Amino acid sequence: PYTITGAPRVVKGNVLIVNGGAELGVRGYLSAYSAETGSLVWRFYTVPNPNKQPDGAISDNALKDIGNLTWGDEGAWTTDGGGGTVWDSIVYDEVNDSVIFGVGNGSPWNRNHRDAGKGDNLFLSSIVAVDASTGAYKWHFQTTPGDNWDYTATQTIILADLPIGSEGASRRVAMQAPKNGFFYVVDADTGEYLSGEAFVPQNWAEGLDENGRPIEKPEARYGETPFMQNPGPLGAHNWQPMAFNPDLGLVYIPAQEAPEFYAVDRLFKTRVQNWNTGTSLPAGIPMDLDLATAMAIRATLKGRLIAWDPIAQEARWSVEHLNAWNGGVLSTAGGL
């Protein structure tokens, strides 16, 4: 089935349209249509064809050289499309003439069901850059390799020029605070990882390595044992837009702390036009959970507005909200 949540964008005479609903068993892509004729100009698929053969699309070379190598030949992805929908963030970088977009979660969420628990599954949960005119692949940075938790990278992508180059020289960067709880700064021209740090408390990774890859805690894969994880599938930051004030050099993130128990759905079977995750969230909750513990868990649900310094990779200030789920942010030149 076709669904869409993010608004189309117009870049250089082309209308960029995407699809949503990875859990419905679809394969993600970004399409460019001519605004004048309505004809398809190019299409970039975010995950391989299930048989790993060419699609006749501009993404063929990138998938052949990069994507196919990170997927196995078995698992639900071969019949369910693999996911990777581009359901929100798309930006045009006029300096590098690139379209930069965020890719969503896998179908199903649980990698053990999706791909027999193997591989990074590119370009799931990645920031991808393509040529604005042709759609040809330029670079990618994967925020959550082998995503297992609905940790999309479709959240707001902001372009900026920051003084983080050699001797404080300005550098064109892309910034994102995706669901997984880490704030990333990458080079907008090459995709090189520059820095990253957790912007909310999280318990699924020890941190990021020198290449920006999360250092996962083994228990976070919730194989035999359910795991209560922060962030949960709602993420540390969801679709609510974040904002950047270039005068102050701060990014304002509508963040949340919403942990969740993850467990394997051992009875998983794809259901057409249904929500297919391969993950049993209720099954992860201990049946003997006492009221006091349940209330303590509920008290951990928080929302906050964080003013984040992308150079120092730390919060300047934060304001806690009564509820976890709040609205987006607009930062003005007047200081609001």
Positions of predicted regions on the chain:
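Noncatalytic, solvent-exposed loop/strand surfaces
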Residues: 1-336
